[in-house]
Structures are given as structure tokens and as C-alpha cells.
Swiss-Prot record:
A molecular-function term among this protein's GO annotations: flavin adenine dinucleotide binding
Cellular component aspect of the GO annotation: cytosol; peptidoglycan-based cell wall; plasma membrane
Gene: fadE25
Entry keyword RNA-binding: no
The protein's name in its UniProt record: Probable acyl-CoA dehydrogenase FadE25
This protein's UniProt keywords: FAD, Flavoprotein, Oxidoreductase
Cofactor: FAD
Length: 389
């Protein structure tokens, strides 16, 4: 009697071969060029220049840039894979490809062809970086209450105000900036602009001192009569808030991917350590309590990865109503990352609480994934509104 051998050609929930090849390539690069510097990057809170060089030279710094602008034209799932694999060894370095997408997605979705040609090739071929400026000190979750203003002045726009929590601030060449152009129209009076680091009246504040992702600078941005050309507006005046929300629908899965990578890195470290660590004359991986913790950790990571890839695939297809799945993928994956990294530290015992091992760094880095691109409480607001409308 011949047993059933399965149907190898059944490809539902199976990534295409080119995605697997990309994963292998970026994993090899991350382990060789990025991982050896991760602990020092964290300890010294310095930008991961080695990672930037490696990602730029291999084309992984901004894989999402369309081919017509000199990029690889990688789809949303492939972009998530790149971010995930870099985050598996260094969350700070993973913010290079992640924030390059965040800082350009509004332009890709709503910008003019001329503006795209001005900005995107610099990221694709010249190693430039981009950041996203939405939040302000008094306009965080309530982003529509922002106070930064933009006023038309002939063929230019004049920006005044300040933005905060800008990831990779001071390292980026281009910034997508949201500003109020019509104060009387609320959210419909907000517009989006591309600001260059050398624009008159634009300055970057000092770096924040943070719990985690210490290698990625977080700064304020200041606009003091910042003058930019009139064609640097993204879309029509008053459409900026819609552009901001559409951007987040496409980029929240990338934060989910970062969270999955952090969790996977912690899980990998925990598995290796529990196999090696001996107590009571045997490896602690033989103890059922440890086995159950590892099983739960792996189960959560796998579920988070599938949700992130599903959200990214739906975004790539251009499906409407991405709000729920994008928020869910970011929210679930980041909660998983916090749980898994905490359990990884627990499995290491006292050793996990020291900087001799990477799990404490993974745990500190995981926390931000529950906060940026909308706190997980806001993600639940987004999801519940989608369910109840």
C-alpha cells in the first residue's frame, strides 16, 4: 500500500521562490555585516553605519522603490521580509528600510510624477534616506490637532512649527511633513509636503535618549520660515491627512514585520541557550516547563508572521479598507514581540538580564513597536471602528 505523499504544487500560504531567495540573501547579509555590530551600536547609541553601507551596496535599503525610479520594485511582502530579517539581528538597523518606506509611501501613493522623479531615485541609487513627520508634542494620537503651519507665498510654501519623535531624524535627506494649510477646515485643512534637509529655515533637534532602538536617532524637526518650492506639495492642498492615514495603512505591516523579526531573534537565542544550559545534570530544554514556554513563543511568532504577510499582501493588491488588517497586524505582532522577548529573558534567568546576551536588547527594542505608528490602544480604536461602522 502506497501512502499519500501530499501535493507539493499546492502553493496556498507558500511564498514564491523569489521571496525565499530574497530572505536567504538578506539573512546572510544581516548575519555577516549587521549582527557583529548590534551590541556596540546599542551600547554606544550610535547610528549603524555598517548596516547602512551593507544595505545600500546590496540594494536592500529601500527595496520598495518602483523600478521606474531606479529601485527594485519589491512588493510589500518582500519588503516586510527584508525588515524582518534585519530586525532579527538588530532592530535599529531594520529602521533603515522600514522608515525609508514610511518616509516615501505618501509620495508614492499621492505625489506628482515630477516630485517622485525628484525624490525616489536618490533613495534607490544614491543611498539617501527618508523620514516621516506627523507627530507633535501636543498632537500625538490626536494628530489632526497639529499646529505646524504652511502658507503659500508666490511659487513657494513657508512652513513654521515643530515636529517630534522623528525616526532617523538628522540622517535623512528627505522628510514627508504634514502641516496645516487651512486652519478652519480641521483635518481637511492639512497638507503633505516633501522637505529637503538643506531647505532654508529647516533644522534638526538633538537626539532623544531612549530605552531601545538606540542606534536609530529620534529627534525633533524645526521649521522657522522654512521655504520650499511650490511643487513639493504631495497631492492637492487639504489632502494631507488622508495621505497620512493611507501611508499608515501600507506601513503598519512593516512595523509588524520588525516586531516579528525581533521576536524571532529572541526565540532563536532562547532555543540555543536552553539547549546549552545545564541544570540538575541535564539541559534545561528537557524540562517540560521550558518546552511549553518555547512552544508558546514559537506559536505566537508564527501566527504574527502570517498576519503580517496577509496584511502586506492585501496592501500590495490595493484592496480597499485596509485599516483593520493593517492595524491588527501591527498590534498583534508587537504584542507578541513584547511577550516573546520577555519570556526569552526569563528563560535565560539572571544571564538574560545582563548585556552579555542579546535578549535584554531585544526586549527593550520590542517595546517601541507597541508605540510608534500609532499606539496599540489606537490600533484597537481603528479596528473597532472598522468593525462597528
Amino acid at each position: 500500500m502506497v501512502g499519500w505523499a501530499g501535493n507539493p504544487s499546492f502553493d496556498l500560504f507558500k511564498l514564491p521562490e523569489e521571496h525565499d531567495e530574497m530572505r536567504s540573501a538578506i539573512r546572510a547579509l544581516a548575519e555577516k555585516e549587521i549582527a557583529p555590530h548590534a551590541a556596540e551600536v546599542d551600547e554606544k547609541a550610535r547610528f549603524p553605519e555598517e548596516a547602512l553601507v551593507a544595505l545600500n551596496s546590496s540594494g536592500f535599503n529601500a527595496v520598495h522603490i518602483p523600478e521606474e525610479y531606479g529601485g527594485q520594485g519589491a512588493d510589500s511582502v518582500a519588503t516586510c521580509i527584508v525588515i524582518e530579517e534585519v530586525a532579527r539581528v538588530d532592530a535599529s538597523a531594520s529602521l533603515i528600510p522600514a522608515v525609508n518606506k514610511l518616509g516615501t509611501m505618501g509620495l508614492i501613493l499621492r505625489g506628482s510624477e515630477e516630485l517622485k522623479k525628484q525624490v525616489l531615485p536618490a533613495l534607490a541609487a544614491e543611498g539617501a534616506m527618508a523620514s516621516y513627520a506627523l507627530s507633535e508634542r501636543e498632537a500625538g494620537s490626536d494628530a489632526a490637532s497639529m499646529r505646524t503651519r504652511a502658507k503659500a507665498d508666490g511659487d513657494h510654501w513657508i512652513l513654521n512649527g515643530a515636529k517630534c519623535w522623528i525616526t532617523n531624524g538628522g540622517k535623512s535627506t528627505w522628510y514627508t511633513v504634514m502641516a496645516v494649510t487651512d486652519p478652519d477646515r480641521g483635518a481637511n485643512g492639512i497638507s503633505a509636503f516633501m522637505v529637503h534637509k538643506d531647505d532654508e529655515g529647516f533644522t534638526v533637534g538633538p537626539k532623544e535618549r531612549k530605552l531601545g532602538i538606540k542606534g536609530s536617532p529620534t529627534t525633533e524637526l524645526y521649521f522657522e520660515n522654512c521655504r520650499i518650492p511650490g511643487d513639493r506639495i504631495i497631492g492637492e492642498p487639504g489632502t494631507g491627512f488622508k495621505t497620512a492615514l493611507a501611508t499608515l495603512d501600507h506601513t503598519r505591516p512593516t512595523i509588524g514585520a520588525q516586531a516579528v523579526g525581533i521576536a524571532q531573534g529572541a526565540l532563536d537565542a532562547a532555543i540555543a541557550y536552553t539547549k546549552d544550559r545545564k541544570q540538575f545534570g541535564e539541559s534545561i530544554s528537557t524540562f517540560q516547563a521550558v518546552q511549553f514556554m518555547l512552544a508558546d513563543m514559537a506559536m505566537k511568532v508564527e501566527a504574527a508572521r502570517l498576519m503580517v504577510y496577509s496584511a502586506a499582501a492585501r496592501a500590495e493588491r490595493g484592496e480597499p479598507d485596509l485599516g483593520f488588517i493593517s492595524a491588527a497586524s501591527k498590534c498583534f505582532a508587537s504584542d507578541v514581540a513584547m511577550e516573546v522577548t520577555t519570556d526569552a529573558v526569563q528563560l535565560f534567568g539572571g544571564a538574560g538580564y545582563t548585556t552579555d546576551f542579546p535578549v535584554e536588547r531585544f526586549m527593550r527594542d520590542a517595546k517601541i513597536t507597541q508605540i510608534y505608528e500609532g499606539t496599540n490602544q489606537i490600533q484597537r480604536v481603528v479596528m473597532s471602528r472598522a468593525l462597528l461602522r
